[in-house]
């Protein structure tokens, strides 16, 4: 379970960078005293992007863990999945 490079990582990084851009926009909007509706909309976009990235990362990691169980590492995989479950 030491290899934490997954095929989905570039897509996840892209989503997180998009969220980072949205968050920077939200900060600018706050400083410009934009409307609460506009701010809420952008905050929702940030939240959605982060949730989507987290979900994709967790799903990909579960698949990776299941592949490890096929290789005989079931006890350590179970422990890691239990740790991961608290973030769902």
Tell me the role of every PLM-derived stretch:
Residues 1-88:
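Solvent-exposed interaction patches of small proteins and small membrane subunits
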């Amino acid at each position: 379970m030491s290899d934490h490079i997954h095929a989905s990582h570039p897509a996840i990084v892209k989503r997180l960078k998009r969220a980072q851009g949205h968050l920077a926009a939200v900060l600018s909007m706050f400083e410009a005293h934009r409307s609460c509706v506009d701010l809420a909309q952008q905050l929702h976009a940030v939240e959605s992007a982060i949730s989507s990235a987290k979900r994709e990362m967790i799903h990909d990691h579960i698949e990776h863990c299941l592949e490890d169980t096929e290789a005989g590492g079931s006890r350590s995989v179970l422990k890691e999945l239990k740790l991961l479950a608290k973030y769902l």
